[in-house]
Amino acid sequence: MRAKPQSPLPRNPVPAWSPPTTTTDPMLEKDAAGGDFPANLVLQLMPLKTFPAAIRGVIQSELNYSVILQWVVTMDPEPVLSWTFSGVPCGMGEKLFIRRLSCEQLGTYMCIATNSKKQLVSEPVTISLPKPIMQPTEAEPMEPDPTLSLSGGSAIGLLAAGILGAGALIAGMCFIIIQSLRTDRQRIGICS
């Protein structure tokens, strides 16, 4: 006597943040008639084709945008493909179109291919909203560097030294110009 067919979904679903590659979960190792496959059989989870593209098993999409999930699987005889959303059947066929994505449609999707000989399960894909862009934080006020700050007496001293330096520069330039003019007059006087 054969065991009753059980749910094709795993007892312990694989977390979406860690895309699976293989499993040995006996719940996934049932044929369509409900018979057991050998317990040491390694079941390969097949990836889905998605739009937008899934990264590490996660599709990030804005609300009201379309999401397309597709699973191309080759089995003999031809399988029946059924889609699940968080463990609940939600569609049939090779493609699942989610038009105008809403908050209620965010979650984990899987596809199950069943024929008279066996059953295959796709890798789970989680649809989520994009992570918000972090706003820049307010800059903390910087403390002035005490070695470069001027205040009080040192500021007045620097200002006075600057004024005296500028005065000396101007006086030196005037002296050079006057000397140059005197020298030119003396040359003219000698030549005449």
Swiss-Prot record:
Keyword Transmembrane helix on entry: yes
Taxonomy, superkingdom: Eukaryota
Glycosylation sites: N64
Matches recorded under InterPro entries: Ig-like_dom, Ig-like_dom_sf, Ig-like_fold
Domain Ig-like: 20-128
Assigned GO CC terms: plasma membrane
Pro residues bias: start-end ranges: 7-18
Compartments where found: Cell membrane
UniProt topology in membrane: Single-pass membrane protein
Entry keyword set: Cell membrane, Glycoprotein, Immunoglobulin domain, Membrane, Transmembrane, Transmembrane helix
Region described as Disordered: 1-26
Tissue: Expressed in bone and small intestine. Highly expressed in osteoclasts, and low expressed in osteoblasts and peripheral blood mononuclear cells (PBMCs).
GO biological process terms on file: osteoclast differentiation
Transmembrane segments: 158-178
The keyword Membrane is annotated on this UniProt entry: yes
Location, primary (coarse class): membrane
Function of the molecule: May be involved in osteoclast differentiation.
Protein name: Immunoglobulin superfamily member 23
Organism ancestry: Eukaryota, Metazoa, Chordata, Craniata, Vertebrata
